[in-house]
Amino acid sequence: MSVSAFNRRWAAVILEALTRHGVRHICIAPGSRSTPLTLAAAENSAFIHHTHFDERGLGHLALGLAKVSKQPVAVIVTSGTAVANLYPALIEAGLTGEKLILLTADRPPELIDCGANQAIRQPGMFASHPTHSISLPRPTQDIPACWLVSTIDHALGTLHAGGVHINCPFAEPLYGEMDDTGLSWQQRLGDWWQDDKPWLREAPRLESEKQRDWFFWRQKRGVVVAGRMSAEEGKKVALWAQTLGWPLIGDVLSQTGQPLPCADLWLGNAKATSELQQAQIVVQLGSSLTGKRLLQWQASCEPEEYWIVDDIEGRLDPAHHRGRRLIANIADWLELHPAEKRQPWCVEIPRLAEQAMQAVIARRDAFGEAQLAHRISDYLPEQGQLFVGNSLVVRLIDALSQLPAGYPVYSNRGASGIDGLLSTAAGVQRASGKPTLAIVGDLSALYDLNALALLRQVSAPLVLIVVNNNGGQIFSLLPTPQSERERFYLMPQNVHFEHAAAMFELKYHRPQNWQELETAFADAWRTPTTTVIEMVVNDTDGAQTLQQLLAQVSHL
């Protein structure tokens, strides 16, 4: 009997089971203990294979692939700390709804807690963050193949969002020629190998029913808050709100076209909040709101009803409103709850939104990060997509820009970390094959710098804008102690990215004005390669411009 041969047959069942649940992309890091899984993945023609040497980046690459494909994405890593590096991506997926399947190779039980090399306690290491966790036994023919495949099917068949952790211990030897060991064990699955359906099929979950009193509520004064959603949903939500005559407050990730732009500015005006107090119902479609003023208003508003519609399960309202948590696909929910044509009831807010945008436009000429945020829609590639980083840059775009309705926008706004942003953007581009504009800050770029290796492999032009304001300038917006701000919060690194781009053989530009930036873009969109554009700005200009605009708009 060959241990290595049976390890591979056991792994082949696992990998084949994944294909029955829509897994096409599989991300693989190098490792020895994961050899059975890696070889099984390599031999399965259903998979598109992605590789990376950094497990943390690999997890975020999978996250980006899942964001676009809307299908589960598998990750294979070896044992030890390689597994722990998947934690950030797993946490983000749990909060934003992407499906990740983490196949973590492990030492067999007799090598745990005895000083064996690269052997840690992996079962349960992700605590409550996976939707499902499976600790498989050491491969053995004493366990029927139908148990293995049905165990995988149960976890994936009931997976609506988040991650599944499948821990896979393998004993040595891990290498060797294939023989007939375990062939009959594998063949007991019969024609399942030729089929394309799961061995075990479970009924999908029930979604929220139609709200029978909707015809009553749609005649009231309402407000629509649009959070993270798809491009298709964004266009539908915009039309739905317009028909109802309700003001739409659109987040940067809503893809609604933000018909009332600069919401994070005008929500700081007392006239706007006073008018919003007249709302009898607030319907929030999608979660992960960005703007500080929006979150402050959302926390303080007291309508008769507050409904939150999102296909992610769980509580999504940090303000704990009285109302309804409706678990449903947004587009499907809109069809069940049609709008009735009514006249807009808000008067002040459209005027304030227009005046706020004019105030932003009046400042657009200076070469700075706030102005870039406002102009970002001018640089979007046709038939492309936008990936927005975290920290200050996403807040500036949310507050100062107006993105086109239905234009795809992606971000990691679940846990809102700055780790893995470049890797996620790489996954977004690979899954879509579209021209991609990604924008991050200098610390975010440094944090995931080795992901530039992933950006060497793109199928369409990708432009990475690094806004270099020399540190974490978002802390300039917070009441951090002035005496300790630079050392303990901003942490300026005084670096530039020309040599990093050169090391990975990526094109690089460092424009000094808008004309040079436009020339760099024109050059970048011509070829299916990655271009790094470093925009060096004065440290605090972006934060100061936002604060000045907030003060100006609050007094309109």
UniProtKB/Swiss-Prot annotation:
GO molecular function: 2-succinyl-5-enolpyruvyl-6-hydroxy-3-cyclohexene-1-carboxylic-acid synthase activity; magnesium ion binding; manganese ion binding; thiamine pyrophosphate binding
Annotated source species: Escherichia coli O139:H28 (strain E24377A / ETEC)
Function: Catalyzes the thiamine diphosphate-dependent decarboxylation of 2-oxoglutarate and the subsequent addition of the resulting succinic semialdehyde-thiamine pyrophosphate anion to isochorismate to yield 2-succinyl-5-enolpyruvyl-6-hydroxy-3-cyclohexene-1-carboxylate (SEPHCHC).
Annotated metabolic or biological route of this protein: Quinol/quinone metabolism; 1,4-dihydroxy-2-naphthoate biosynthesis; 1,4-dihydroxy-2-naphthoate from chorismate: step 2/7; Quinol/quinone metabolism; menaquinone biosynthesis
Record gene name: menD
Cofactor note: Binds 1 thiamine pyrophosphate per subunit.
KW Isomerase (keyword) present: no
Protein's recorded name: 2-succinyl-5-enolpyruvyl-6-hydroxy-3-cyclohexene-1-carboxylate synthase
Family indicated by similarity: Belongs to the TPP enzyme family. MenD subfamily.
